[in-house]
Amino acid sequence: MAINRWLFSTNHKDIGTLYLIFGAWAGMVGTALSLLIRAELGQPGSLLGDDQIYNVIVTAHAFVMIFFMVMPVMIGGFGNWLVPLMIGAPDMAFPRMNNMSFWLLPPSFLLLLASAGVEAGAGTGWTVYPPLAGNMAHAGRSVDLTIFSLHLAGISSILASINFITTIINMKPPAVSQYQTPLFVWSILVTTVLLLLSLPVLAAGITMLLTDRNLNTTFFDPAGGGDPILYQHLFWFFGHPEVYILILPGFGMISHVVAYYSGKKEPFGYMGMVWAMMAIGLLGFIVWAHHMFTVGMDVDTRAYFTSATMIIAIPTGVKVFSWLATLHGGSIKWETPLLWALGFIFLFTVGGLTGIVLANSSLDIVLHDTYYVVAHFHYVQTMGAVFAIMAGFIHWFPLMSGFTLHSTWTKIQFVLMFIGVNLTFFPQHFLGLAGMPRRYSDYPDAYALWNTVSSIGSLISLVAVIMLLFIIWEAFSSKREVLSIELPNTNVEWLHGCPPPYHTYEEPAFVQVQRSF
């Protein structure tokens, strides 16, 4: 019965599929919200109403894209599908908890949408800073609903993280060491450790905000001896690792895609890649205050956070050059996933360079809360995380469905999307350097040109997203079956055929390890 299969599933492949479908649906909502933002900003003057409704849309766009699109797709979707197949496990360590992790997300999403639907909505930005998020500036239940939504999404992620960590450490064949697992498995391991360490801090911060709003505590209210800066420290101690949580699984997927389409049996510098991911994970926890350069920190504190932030560029550079070295000398197959991966490498590097600019506290004081930061963030996320999702989706779609996507149309869709996102976000660097602040629904006429260009870019991206839906429909409609897979011995997820049987590795895999070191 369909209800038993999908509602009560304990199968990692089915739960992965549920995550992918949920993430795609949330992605449509998040895209719609982003188009409302760009429609409002396409011309000077007001379109949708006041700043409150505009900021509700901005806040919802951020939460939907982060918690209900990127994380469910990368960690829940690709993680569930691929990790057990890549390590030879019959399923996840805790299959029923896996099911609960997924089913906590739709109620969480519902609470977030409800927060926008009651009173005036939560127009706080995704950071939910008090006193704007307090009960004076945001009377009513909107912010409370947002907090409960975040609680549920957080519990979901923590449970999934426990599940992945246990699975990856305990469910490998005995002969396989951790340093022989694929890089995607490593990326999920590092990501889930980051989630496990950072989410409880967010939970503490938003719970304190909840009691400040409803129970008259004063954690963040100077009138009772509290400090709103404490909230910023708690939030960003989660918020900075979060952006690495969003990109690390993408790093893992890009490593697989680049190696596969370069015709290599493994990525260049495997150990360097692993240690780089662990270094990024560690450093991600000790740089949070670079989001707070404008709150009046000591000069030595600012110096520390500036240098610590710049250090993250080193392991990131190790990864970028290892991807390029993997491509070097390969028999390159110019298929769509590789195009997405190459776009990722180039544009993520551009985003990383603007990150180096923002790491300088003196420069950041000028650029903070301008569109320069928006441009930086969207270069590393839209053109990092989303490009990685696209590369991984097109690469593994035949594995998950048994059908192949139309290669020419996916290439056209890549070109459209590439033009769209660059046209959307590149001009925002100019707006930021010219001093246009974020989170305002209107602007002086001087900023009109680049805002118009940016909004046109967003419409091109929309066409590309709609085209992707058509391409997926076309694949299921035409039913072109997979013919052959190259190098299934080094890409073990393909070993069982496309799609793999409902249950794989029912007997423990026999692994004979050849040690080359």
From Swiss-Prot:
Subunit and interaction comment: Component of the cytochrome c oxidase (complex IV, CIV), a multisubunit enzyme composed of 14 subunits. The complex is composed of a catalytic core of 3 subunits MT-CO1, MT-CO2 and MT-CO3, encoded in the mitochondrial DNA, and 11 supernumerary subunits COX4I, COX5A, COX5B, COX6A, COX6B, COX6C, COX7A, COX7B, COX7C, COX8 and NDUFA4, which are encoded in the nuclear genome.
Any Gene Ontology CC annotation: respiratory chain complex IV
Residue ranges annotated as Mitochondrial matrix topological domain: 1-11, 87-94, 171-182, 262-269, 328-335, 401-406, 479-517
Segments traversing the membrane: 12-40, 51-86, 95-117, 141-170, 183-212, 228-261, 270-286, 299-327, 336-357, 371-400, 407-433, 447-478
List of residues binding Na(+): 40, 45, 441
Binding, O2: 244
Family matches, as Gene3D superfamilies: Cytochrome c oxidase-like, subunit I domain (1.20.210.10)
Mitochondrial intermembrane side: 41-50, 118-140, 213-227, 287-298, 358-370, 434-446
Stated role: Component of the cytochrome c oxidase, the last enzyme in the mitochondrial electron transport chain which drives oxidative phosphorylation. The respiratory chain contains 3 multisubunit complexes succinate dehydrogenase (complex II, CII), ubiquinol-cytochrome c oxidoreductase (cytochrome b-c1 complex, complex III, CIII) and cytochrome c oxidase (complex IV, CIV), that cooperate to transfer electrons derived from NADH and succinate to molecular oxygen, creating an electrochemical gradient over the inner membrane that drives transmembrane transport and the ATP synthase.
UniProt protein name: Cytochrome c oxidase subunit 1
Sites where the protein binds Cu cation: 240, 290-291
Name of the encoding gene: MT-CO1
Lineage of producing organism: Eukaryota, Metazoa, Chordata, Craniata, Vertebrata
Cofactor requirement: heme; Cu cation
Keyword Membrane on entry: yes
